[in-house]
């Protein structure tokens, strides 16, 4: 069955109404993000990213966080600079031992921690707004106004996107980067436009400067250009003329544009850093990742030629080493592994996606099969990259969250919308999408403001999330502030002992509580607040990172909670309060 093409006379007649509807939906999604982030404590990685953001934007050096590219942190950093934040204290020549650490920087700053993280998170919420709007506009081009509006509605209330739109991290930016790059490249292919190829290159460069996994976009864009070249050759042969090579010229233009954006981002972040200091930062980072000396030598050679390229190469090399050696302990449905699970992201997608979203995809797959929807370049551009991401995810040893698969959500949704509007009458397609979106909205509102801990009802909901997954899927440290408020409400702050996993500072939030120090601290009877992550894999993760004494302490805690602890309350879905009884003799 041939796909129906976009009819400008239908869709362009109401651009104001379309734009208003999409902007309102995107704004509603952002409102949910703002509402949950005002209550969320810093997640595990946020103090690191916030310190790095301030370093890049205010100090103009790049000693911290080489394992991530700088673009998102530059956005956060310039927002912090405008709000009056300071740069972290880092002496030159640089020494890791003397550098200010993330938690002291975050909680002993001119800005209160709530304001510091609120300002740093704001640019990520803006990226979420842009993702919703850009997805709606792209679908509108191919399927009309109604399809675009329903796409915006489904994305604006998708719980995983909402969760990570409120975190200083790179995952939401990767979702926007994948979608924008692929859609612009597909449009450039359709229209034979060098301008669109240049725009795709800018989007590609921004994606590469946002997250290292976006390097997977490079072969995808090259493949689209090859499709364009084959099409040009075929059309030129029919017409008896030489091919115009627009796709090849477009690919070269996109490559140049992406390089300018990528290395320009690094240049801004390290504008006050000398080449020797850049090389020193590269060596310190790669040694900390236990990279082979041969790898370090090659990256340092690149750094001597270009400090920007050297930092990018160091980040890629560090990720590669981590994937080979393991980045930590992974948890899946009761099992632990440092090597990862091939099925991890398939399970995570199944239990972390809303039932409404999954229903839309299932109906679209059924319609595509029974109506024999013919896949064109646009549909393949939207469907094959998610398949590629899932396949590459099977080989990774770093299984820490569905957040690494955020790019598949807008791509798969856009593909589903196109299939439904091509194969069904518009009212039937709209009914399917509206039903799925309303179901998803109900699921999201039911768990709000705990979107980070979302699990669908088929998996048992967030209360059963710990049986499936942990880490950034459930417990990333976001509920520490809520815990402090709960303890004060109960009148239990002074008698509570807190065993916490995350980026928050326990003495800041609960100054009268006792902080559990695993190495050597006894596990006494009383009221305990314990992070879910520590119960599932705290001892194993601590041992993996070279702290046997801490691992032994966490193992004692887990044993004590399992054998003589009674759950008396829960904070969000990531922290449980236990009444720990005396040990029977």
Segments (PLM) and residue ranges:
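Transmembrane-helix motifs of polytopic, lipid-linked glycan transferases
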Residues: 122-142, 180-184, 369
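Short helix- or helix-capping micro-motifs
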Residues: 151-156, 183, 204, 208
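Interfacial juxtamembrane loops and adjacent helix segments
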Residues: 62-125, 276-339
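Signature aromatic-anchored transmembrane alpha helix within multi-pass, membrane-resident enzymes
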Residues: 20-25, 219-222, 251-260, 369-375, ...
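Membrane-interface transmembrane helices that cradle and orient dolichyl/undecaprenyl
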Residues: 181-197
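C-terminal luminal/periplasmic domains and tails of membrane-associated envelope-modifying transferases
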Residues: 7, 290, 294-301, 305, ...
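Transmembrane alpha-helix segments characteristic
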Residues: 26, 150-151, 361-365, 373-394, ...
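Hydrophobic, aromatic-rich transmembrane alpha-helices
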Residues: 348, 353-376, 431-434
